[in-house]
């Protein structure tokens, strides 16, 4: 599970009224720009609930979740590992991996691409198994500015909808060590 220290670091709280985890989403300067929520109800689909909800509608996201909290570690390592969802950032933080962020969807938008280019460090995409980053136009554009790598589950260690951190630290380590460069 996710450690109390990681929950506190990212200011995650439980909303008993909606049975959701709620968390602030910050811009790169640390200012809260939205509040996200993730249902804990295992029957959310059958009940017609949204898995994720946000206080304000987004339009096009202009931030990367976790960038403000993890900026120092990202710059120190010269690398940012990008997941789809915030849960993966929290789980990686629990594993002691602090150079992470989440794009909060399965594709990179132009605003996020500009943020990553401005960071100037290696970008490692660690998206869910069912996502093929080679089809993403903005990821292809990003490689003009920075070194882009990605995780590929060639040994079928993950379930179809799993994030690379969902199956434990050993699985994560194998996937990370086998990362490939986007050409």
Set out the residue ranges of the language-model regions.
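Short, solvent-exposed polar/charged micro-motifs at secondary-structure junctions
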Residues: 16-18, 45, 158-166
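Hydrophobic, Leu/Ile/Phe/Ala-enriched alpha-helical segments that form helix-helix packing faces
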Residues: 1, 142-143
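Phosphate-handling DNA/RNA-contact segment within nucleic-acid enzymes
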Residues: 2-119, 136-137
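Mg2+-dependent endonuclease catalytic cores in nucleic-acid-processing enzymes, primarily RNase H-like
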Residues: 131-141
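A charged alpha-helical hairpin associated with nucleic-acid processing machineries
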Residues: 75-79, 121, 140, 147-158, ...
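Short hydrophobic alpha-helical runs that function as membrane-insertion/retention elements
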Residues: 100-103, 122-126, 149-150
């Amino acid at each position: 599970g996710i450690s109390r220290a990681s929950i506190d670091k990212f200011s995650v709280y439980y909303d008993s009224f909606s049975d959701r985890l709620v968390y602030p989403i910050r811009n790169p300067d640390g200012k809260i720009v939205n509040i996200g929520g993730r249902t804990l109800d295992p029957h959310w689909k059958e009940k017609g609930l949204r898995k994720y909800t946000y206080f304000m509608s987004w339009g096009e996201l202009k931030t990367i979740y976790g960038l403000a909290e993890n900026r120092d570690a990202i710059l120190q390592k010269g690398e940012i590992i990008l997941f789809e969802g915030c849960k993966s950032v929290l789980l990686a933080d629990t594993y002691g991996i602090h150079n992470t962020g989440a794009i909060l969807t399965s594709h990179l938008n132009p605003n996020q691409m500009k943020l990553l280019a401005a960071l100037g460090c290696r970008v490692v995409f660690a998206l869910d198994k069912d996502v093929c980053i080679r089809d993403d136009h903005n990821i292809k554009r990003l490689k003009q500015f920075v070194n882009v790598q990605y995780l590929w589950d060639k040994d079928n260690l993950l379930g179809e909808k799993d994030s690379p951190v969902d199956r434990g630290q050993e699985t994560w380590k194998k996937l990370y060590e086998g990362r490939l460069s986007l050409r």
